[in-house]
Amino acid sequence: MIFDDLKNISFYKGIHPNLDKAIDYLYEHRKDSFDLGKYEIDGDKVFLVVQENVLNKEENDRFEHHKNYADLHLLVEGHEYSSYGSRIKDEAVAFYEASDIGFVHCHEQYPLLLGYHNFAVFFPGEPHQPNGYAGMEDKVRKYLFKILID
């Protein structure tokens, strides 16, 4: 898991070629305004999903995880808590291979406050819980890069 200031994102180039593609795309298009939807960067290896999400104000003990894709979360409007889960307790919802998503319960969680100035990357196998209410806005606009880690 990576949580850092956006100005430092280039430090993470070299971890994986597909992560490099996402970082390069972000630099090339950082001043662009995207409509909601999916944008292919390198087919199914790297793509961007622009979302507007209503934040979850309820307590939630389920963490999503992926086997094949890393998620790079970057908010362009608003603030949210995106929690990192540690020490998986049990499976909450069976893994769905076609969508590369499953849900687990964790013994520990670490909330990360995301805003326009920072980002988080959750690698395959790392439980995370995006879209948590941060006590400010009720919804956020975010860029979610899906990055195949093979």
Regions found by a protein language model. Give the residues of each.
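A short, N-terminal "cap"/entry segment at the start of jelly-roll beta-barrel domains
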Residues: 2-49, 57-60, 65
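A short beta-loop-beta micro-motif enriched in histidine and acidic residues
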Residues: 43, 60-71, 88-93, 107, ...
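Short acidic (Asp/Glu) patches
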Residues: 51-67, 96-109, 127-129
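Glycine- and acidic-residue-biased ligand/ion/polar-headgroup-sensing regions
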Residues: 68-70, 74-80, 88-89, 96-101
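Short beta-strand segments in beta-sandwich/barrel cores
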Residues: 79-82, 127
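Conserved metal-binding segment of the jelly-roll/cupin
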Residues: 113-132
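A short hydrophobic beta-strand segment most commonly corresponding to one strand
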Residues: 119-121, 137-150
